[in-house]
Amino acid sequence: MTFGRGFSYMGNQVHYDKLGHDHWVDLLFFNRILKSLVVIELKKGSFKPAYLGQLAAYLRVLDDEERIEGENPSVGIVLCKDADRAYVEYVLQDYTKPMGVATYKSSQERLRELLPDEEEIKKLL
């Protein structure tokens, strides 16, 4: 996974217990440039609006438990297999926390793009 400048890894599957409820953050970073904690939630399938509710809860807990004076509010990213951009933007309108949704390509798909196809390999043999 490649990130932009300023990211420092803080942990994966980071556990927080808030008011008797368990929260498990998939990936936690701190961005020195943004001066913010950054949560990345990894999802195997397509985007679902419920992911934003989960992410909003994580951001609230992080801002209460981890954020220190001088830091900006925590930022959240849902990383899922695919998402309808128009639908994501529509759903995000009512959220006030800094959140976004991004998509990924699985390693297998990426490898298929990079490797020669079966016919090209046969020609080489």
What are these regions (language model features)?
Residues 1-125:
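Charged, terminal alpha-helix-loop-beta segments
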